[in-house]
Amino acid sequence: MAKPASIKIRLNSTADTGFFYVTKKNARTKTDKMVLKKYDPIVRKHVEFKEGKIK
């Protein structure tokens, strides 16, 4: 069976609130770490979220 192209990743908030999003990315085309600006409801602001592994 072939290895799937997309993998699940965890986007951790850089505001150190412990909030995270779970999303997918294509591991073959996006080899670098993903950094997105998304909404963190704990601090009620848009902050950067950096990619981390799902445990």
UniProtKB/Swiss-Prot annotation:
InterPro entries: Ribosomal_bL33, Ribosomal_bL33_CS, Ribosomal_bL33_sf, Ribosomal_zn-bd. Gene3D superfamilies: Ribosomal protein L33. Keywords: Ribonucleoprotein, Ribosomal protein. SUPFAM superfamilies: Zn-binding ribosomal proteins (SSF57829). One of its GO terms (biological process) is translation. Belongs to the bacterial ribosomal protein bL33 family. This is Large ribosomal subunit protein bL33. It comes from Phenylobacterium zucineum (strain HLK1). The gene is rpmG.
